[in-house]
Amino acid sequence: MKTLMIDMDNCITDALFMKRINEFLGTDYKLEDQTEFRLQKITGDRINEFWQFMKDKSFYDDAPLIKGAYKALEILNKKYDLYIITAFIYPNSNPDISSNNLKFKYEYLKKKLPFISPKQYIFIENKNLIHSDIAIDDKITHLNNSEKKILLTAWHNKNIRDEELNEKGIVRVNTWDEILELLDY
């Protein structure tokens, strides 16, 4: 059976990162207006205050699954050796934030995707340490160690040119229906 690695944030769920930044700053930034992958950079020189603000908060409390993800994951889980792979350590945050984030991600996955066993979760900072037959991610640098590379469009990768993706052997998709079609469903 082929291995399929699927990123959690921005592929399975719309984490509430922007919502938490807006709560902290008292702003109304929109995710679709952003191009930077590391949204926490918006906080500027208040980054340490932001991480303290986030110490006991989750990015996942009411975070929705991305449209079509539940159905697609149910189908793909029967056909592939499927794993959800996700980072839980945020750059420039203290260790308490990362350990809480690990707990919040674990709880979210168990609640929202009960048909996927916790044995199928991989929590890791460097995703390129893991090889898979197929990978689905929103960041091209996380697709290096897979045979079939699928980039799910997100705010921070929408400006990557098709030529660059083609050179790297990456196929762009916009929806979970397109992923199922690409994987012959």
Write out the residue ranges for each language-model feature.
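Short, basic/glycine-rich phosphate-binding loops at helix/coil junctions
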Residues: 41-56, 82-83, 89
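Substrate-recognition element of Asp-dependent hydrolases with the DxDx(T/V) motif
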Residues: 60, 64, 69-102, 109
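A structural signal for isolated positions on well-ordered beta-strands in alpha/beta enzyme cores
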Residues: 81-83, 134, 151
